[in-house]
Amino acid sequence: MSTETRVNERIRVPEVRLIGPGGEQVGIVRIEDALRVAADADLDLVEVAPNARPPVCKIMDYGKYKYEAAQKARESRRNQQQTVVKEQKLRPKIDDHDYETKKGHVVRFLEAGSKVKVTIMFRGREQSRPELGYRLLQRLGADVADYGFIETSAKQDGRNMTMVLAPHRGAKTRARARHPGEPAGGPPPKPTAGDSKAAPN
């Protein structure tokens, strides 16, 4: 079955429910009268609800209508593009230094506009202490709240516990504003002691 919009003489029904160019309800009229009104306004008669009885037609600029519909379709496709999901794994008894390192990774992922699946990996007797993983995930969610939000709350996933963080809207733009001129991968590495030489006097 064709889904092409019928316009003007392609609308082959005896009568239609007509909507004027300003959105006003004209009522049910003969197709000949609807076509004449559209022609007098130098506009098109466009069938907008073909399954109604009688079909609903609106007087409008069909070229403009098609352009706006195409723009909306493109915007919808952009919004539906799959977001990159990164993963960060932690142990429930992680030490502070490792935690700060992992948190830094999560922040960079969020600043880049990626979602982050955070996985707490339990081993052995740790599996009997799910509250450790829950508290750790809640702590991480609070610590990175400036960069993202908890999209999927902590939940048990087999032996692991997972949580999904999503970046705030416009995260990439804010990251560039905070770090102008910095490459996408982060700040340049600091020189090591072997790389530096004493300046001549």
Curated annotation (Swiss-Prot):
The keyword Glycoprotein does not apply. Gene3D superfamilies: Translation initiation factor 3 (IF-3), C-terminal domain, Translation initiation factor 3 (IF-3), N-terminal domain. One of its GO terms (cellular component) is cytosol. InterPro entries: T_IF-3_C_sf (IPR036788), T_IF-3_N_sf (IPR036787), Translation_initiation_fac3_CS (IPR019813), Translation_initiation_fac_3 (IPR001288), Translation_initiation_fac_3_C (IPR019815), Translation_initiation_fac_3_N (IPR019814). Residues 167-201 are annotated as: Disordered. GO terms for molecular function: ribosome binding; translation initiation factor activity. It is found in: Cytoplasm. One of its GO terms (biological process) is ribosome disassembly. It comes from the Bacteria. Residues 169-178 have a biased composition (Basic residues). Keywords: Cytoplasm, Initiation factor, Protein biosynthesis. Its main location: cytoplasm. IF-3 binds to the 30S ribosomal subunit and shifts the equilibrium between 70S ribosomes and their 50S and 30S subunits in favor of the free subunits, thus enhancing the availability of 30S subunits on which protein synthesis initiation begins. Monomer. Belongs to the IF-3 family. PANTHER family: TRANSLATION INITIATION FACTOR IF-3, TRANSLATION INITIATION FACTOR IF-3, MITOCHONDRIAL. This is Translation initiation factor IF-3. It comes from Mycobacterium bovis (strain ATCC BAA-935 / AF2122/97).
